Amino acid sequence: MSNTATFNTSPNLKLSKKLSFGEEVANSVTHAVGAVAMLVLLPITAVHANNGYGMTAAVGMSVFVISLFLMFLSSAIYHAMDYNSPHKMVLRIIDHSMIYIAIAGSYTPVALSLVGGWLGYSIIILQWGTTIFGILYKIFAKKINEKFSLFLYLMMGWLVIFIIPAIVTKTGPAFWGLMLAGGLSYTVGAAFYA
């Protein structure tokens, strides 16, 4: 019996349906464009946040942009791989793990700069703790329950209900509308994932 850990490559994991070459190229290219956009936006966002709101905002926004960069990059690589490649499953695990990172990353600037205090730090701990758990689950579980993963994604996404009062008092209708639109589109998208 070996003591070394291995990636979850169990036959219980399945790749999504095989897409056409054109669909895979389109997915890979659009996600690569998103990754490059995040690289361009990283210094701009960090400098703007630091100049306007201070170092805490710059750190939070940098975490947000880096998390989106990682999500887009992993997805671009995943879709660029041949469907029959032995590495495709590992890339699928990484690609789906980046969803956790993107969700936690999107909460980080809000929790640090808008909410702050014990509630903000509690949200950060919950988000990043769930991210670590979710990634370890994807890597090491003997059988992946996609509905459980979906539950974790949705739970993380809708933790916003606990910080709505802080957000409402510190932002305006445009921010509320964007958050609501993002949450609803994310939830509708999750239905397709399931």
Task: Give residue ranges: language-model regions.
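Multi-pass alpha-helical transmembrane bundles in non-GPCR membrane proteins
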Residues: S2-A194
